[in-house]
Design a protein with these regions (language model features):
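N-terminal secretory signal peptides that target proteins for export/translocation
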Residues: 1-16
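Non-catalytic pre-domain segments flanking phosphatase-related domains
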Residues: 17-75, 81-132, 166-179, 454-464
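C-terminal cap/substrate-recognition subdomain and adjoining C-terminal extension
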Residues: 35-43, 48-54, 62-64, 68, ...
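Ordered hydrophobic segments in well-structured contexts
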Residues: 70-72, 221, 385
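Intrinsically disordered, low-complexity boundary segments flanking structured domains
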Residues: 78-79, 219, 304-308
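Generic structural signal for well-ordered beta-strand positions
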Residues: 80-81, 387
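A metal-dependent, Asp-based hydrolase signature
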Residues: 85, 92-94, 99-265
Length: 464
């Protein structure tokens, strides 16, 4: 992360321009008459937010020289309501769209752990407790793997292998609808969710530890092991299109038999039109736009293309979790070496080690995020705007600090960074932005998740 200001006498000319412009920005960034042609409007955003962003666009030459200005966005729950990795998980299971063989199931989803290996995330290796069954009895990773693999084997032999031509002598005698009525499918649906979400939560009490970040960023991508790049692109595009037409739901299923566990999913996606407007405005002002996502890079890139953002955010401007293919070009779920995990500190590393070099050492002038994994990236902004989607995270999360800054510096800028901080509310029932910094989980009660500054009353903008 960059320090605030270098001494002018030691600064290069481009840096000196940024330093000298800092004082001017505080006045222009929030001025209602900063530019006569400031017509920036992002759909469903508060007028206050639009004014602040519009004034940044109108005055960008005051804070950045040619080639220096750029913006960084998260993708999941920032550009869209919902998470493309989580919703594609539901879609994959609902369609039994897999490629890996049943004999590889346990080795794939053990994530490299065994009974004798351990770290702070899985202190007893595969004998670590993953969660509890419906009776409150502990379930180990080893048990969850073994039980889920048994159901997968039946589904693979009966439907998956013949449907995707994975073996030479298999013929399917059942349709997808028919196989989904079997006990094996119903149990697999619950168990695989219990297994993967259980693994994702195994952070040893430190979600920034190396093992926690690796597990969280790779556990769901293991579902696509064995797929070609074209199959992956088809899967994610089909999943997004299907989820856009679905209700926003979190269905929960329960398995029966020897392992009775609950497994939950999320389904349904919505695109935030205001983010597209913002990206278009940034590009029109000469500001390059980047996406830094914790989803697999191929997922974020395909999502952007599907929504027609390719001209604003070209493929080379999308950074996500990167994985190695095998010699046949098939997906492996093995992380690319010497490349940061694009969550938390890894997002900031993309900014400081890659993007700043491209943009003559300048930090970003705009960032938008929604959760803990975005905080470090959002903290790299200087002389610009930080726009936070308000998902009502409590003050145990670093993202709540950005809610508080939006309230504390409402109508002004933060002295140390010279940033304006915005809070974007949302209606979580229908998955849209609303013209407030407050958000609602039920369409009835609206709140800011901030206790200071009179509960952030200045950002309400609603007649409640």
């Amino acid at each position: 992360m960059r320090t605030e200001v270098m001494k002018c006498e030691a600064a290069e000319p481009s840096t000196m321009v940024r330093v000298l412009a800092a004082a001017a920005l505080s006045a222009t960034l929030l001025a209602s008459t900063a530019a006569a042609d400031n017509f920036f409007i992002a759909a469903e955003a508060p007028d206050y937010n639009n004014k602040v962003v519009g004034n940044l666009l109108a005055n960008i030459s005051s804070v950045r020289g040619p080639g220096e200005a750029y913006a960084v966005f998260d993708w999941d729950n920032t550009c869209m309501f919902g998470d493309i990795s989580y919703t594609s998980f539901y879609y994959q299971v609902d369609n039994l769209n897999f490629r890996f063989a049943p004999e590889d199931f346990e080795s794939i989803f053990s994530l490299g752990y065994n009974a004798s290996s351990s770290d702070i995330c899985l202190t007893n290796g595969t004998n670590s407790v993953l969660g509890q069954d419906v009776n409150g009895t502990d379930v180990t990773l080893a048990t969850a793997l073994s039980e889920t693999a048994q159901d997968y084997k039946v589904l693979y032999e009966s439907y998956i292998a013949p449907t995707y031509n994975l073996t030479s002598n298999s013929t399917s005698n059942v349709t997808l609808d028919e196989i989904k009525e079997t006990a094996e499918y119903l149990n697999f649906r619950a168990k695989i969710s219990f297994l993967l979400f259980g693994l994702e939560a195994m952070d040893g009490g430190d979600d920034h530890s190396q093992c926690a970040m690796k597990i969280a960023m790779t556990v769901f991508p293991h579902l696509i092991v064995g797929m070609t790049e074209d199959e992956l692109k088809t899967l994610i595009r089909s999943s997004i299109r299907w989820n856009l037409g679905q209700a926003l739901e979190e269905p929960t299923y329960t398995s029966t038999g020897d392992l009775a566990v609950e497994g939950s999913y999320t389904k349904g996606l919505r695109f935030f039109n205001g983010q597209e407007s913002t990206m278009r405005g940034l590009r029109a002002a000469g500001i390059d736009v980047y996406i830094i996502s914790a989803s697999p890079q191929i997922y974020a890139a395909e999502a952007g293309n599907l929504f027609g953002l390719g001209n604003m955010v070209p493929k080379d401007n999308v950074f996500g979790v990167r994985f190695k293919p095998d010699d046949a070009g098939l997906f492996t779920a093995e992380l690319v070496e010497n490349y940061p995990i694009t969550w938390g500190p890894g997002k900031a590393t993309i900014v400081t080690s890659i993007l700043e070099e491209i943009h003559q050492g300048a930090p970003p002038v705009y960032s938008s995020g929604d959760t803990t994994g975005d905080c470090e990236m959002m903290n790299t902004v200087r002389d610009g705007v930080v726009d936070t989607n308000n998902r009502l995270k409590d003050n145990s999360s670093c993202i709540n600090d950005f809610y508080q800054k939006a309230c504390e510096y409402f109508g002004t800028t933060e002295p140390i960074t010279n940033n304006a901080y915005l809070l974007q509310g949302q209606d979580q029932v229908i998955g849209t932005w609303i013209t407030s910094g407050f958000s609602t989980k039920d369409g009835v009660t609206y709140e800011s998740a901030v206790t200071a500054d009179n509960g952030c009353a200045a950002y309400q903008f609603l007649d409640l």
